Amino acid sequence: MEAIITKEFFEDKTTIELARDILGMRLVHQTDEGILSGLIVETEAYLGATDMAAHSFQNLRTKRTEVMFSSPGRIYMYQMHRQVLLNFITMPKGIPEAILIRAIEPDEQAKQQMVQNRHGKTGYELTNGPGKLTQALGLSMQDYGKTLFDSNIWLEEAKLPHLIEATNRIGVPNKGIATHFPLRFTVKGSPYISAQRKSRILTDIWK
């Protein structure tokens, strides 16, 4: 087992730095069916009070966003279009910033159960989107509020990307200048990136 990420990982880093630094880390969910896991290949940063695309824009505090005001490493789950999306809180208490996990590269030993969880979906479709990866990993709204440090969900050090690309976030139209913030980070060439073009897939993406 690789080194498990602790609270110290989140210290003295910005949300943007964290969104880049967790690329290549292994996201692990321990379930009744066994360990389900994969390498993170795509993230998006959401910068809280000043980010029109963030749920916590202008420090909006609701029952849904309450966990965003807690502490680094806390898990923020929310539903969108019948899908459940996974986010990690990044900043100290009271600063509601987060990272959305958009795609993972599934680990080989976990694929069989993940395919079952995805009702037979295989290949890149297994985990190449934020709602797809949570379904594959068996995550749900019941995971809201857990932490990465004392629950059945955690991060492990695994691989380092050769190159990281920064582009506009997906699905945030009509959010003023925030629509054009380059806050989506991807492992360049990964076939599991959402909406990845075949012509952009590379065979050697890890150091």
Curated annotation (Swiss-Prot):
It comes from the Bacteria. It holds the Pfam family Pur_DNA_glyco. One of its GO terms (biological process) is base-excision repair. Its EC number is 3.2.2.-. Coiled coil: none annotated. Keywords: DNA damage, DNA repair, Hydrolase. PANTHER family: DNA-3-METHYLADENINE GLYCOSYLASE. This is Putative 3-methyladenine DNA glycosylase. The lineage of its organism: Bacteria, Bacillati, Bacillota, Bacilli, Bacillales.
